[in-house]
Amino acid sequence: MEISIFTVDAFTNLPFKGNPAAICPLSHALRDELYQRIATEMNLSETAFITKINPSDNFTTGSRFCLRWFTPTKEVDLCGHATLASAAVLFQHMKNMNPTVVFETRSGDLSVTRCGEQIVMDFPLNPPTREDPKEFKDIIKAAVGDHPIQDVYLSSSTKKLMIRLADSCDRSVLTSLKVDSTTLLSSERSGRVTGLIITIIGSPDCQPGYDFYSRYFAPWNGIPEDPVTGSAHTVLASYWLEKLGKRKMLAYQCSSRGGELELEVREDGRVNIAGRTVTILQGTITL
C-alpha cells in the first residue's frame, strides 16, 4: 500500500518557519493503530489524515471530508495548524474546486475557505475562566519563574491553562523563558491541564502591529513546545477580545520558528483564524 504525504509549514509564507504538519489524503480509512504509527514515524507535532466520506467521492470536487489529528503519542480533538495545512493540500495539490470545504472532526464540523493567498478557518471559540493562581502555583513557577503575572485563566473545554505575564514584561522576556517539559509534567498531574499558554500584550502601534504575543507548551501530549498553535488561539482570542475590546486582532506566536495569525471573533461565538502555508515536501509512504 502506498500513501501520499505532504509536509506543510502553516501560518507562514516562508519555508522552515511556522508550524510543520504532515498531511495524508486517504481514499479510505485506516486502522487506528496505523494512524498512530505514521504520526509517530513523522514525529511532527501533528500528522493529519484527510479521508473521503464515501468511496465515490473525489478530492477535486468533494466539499466534505473526515479529518483526524495525531501527535507522536496520541489522537487529539482539535489542531489548527494541521487543519490549515490539510486545506492547503486539498486546494493547492488536489486542485479542489470548491471555495469552501468542510471537515468532519471530533470537534464538530470545521469549514475552511480560501481567500486570496490566505486560508480562513471557522473554529469554535473556547472562552477561559479566571482561576486562583495559588491553585496552579507549581506549574506557574515551572513556566515563568519569578516573573510577575497578571492573569491566570483555564479553558476547561480544551484543558489549556493560560498565564498572562504582567505588562512590565516585554517580548524579550517571553522569548527568553526556558520552559522544561519534565518540570511541567511533574508540576501538573491532575489531568485538568494538557496545554500551557503564556501570553503578553502586544505593540499594536508598532509595525506590523501585533495585538498580543504567545508561546504554547504541551508535553502532556508529547509536544515540548508547539511552534504555532491555532487551537490555542481559540482561547486567546476570547481572552484578548475581553481585554482589548477588539474583534479583529493580529497575533504572533514567539517560538523559534514563529508564526502569524489573523483573528476575527464573530458575533455567533466562533472565531475565524487566517494564515498562509508553504508546502516543502511531497512523497509516498510505502507499507
What are these regions (language model features)?
Residues M1-L78, L84-L287:
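Active-site proximal loop and beta-alpha junction motif in alpha/beta enzyme cores
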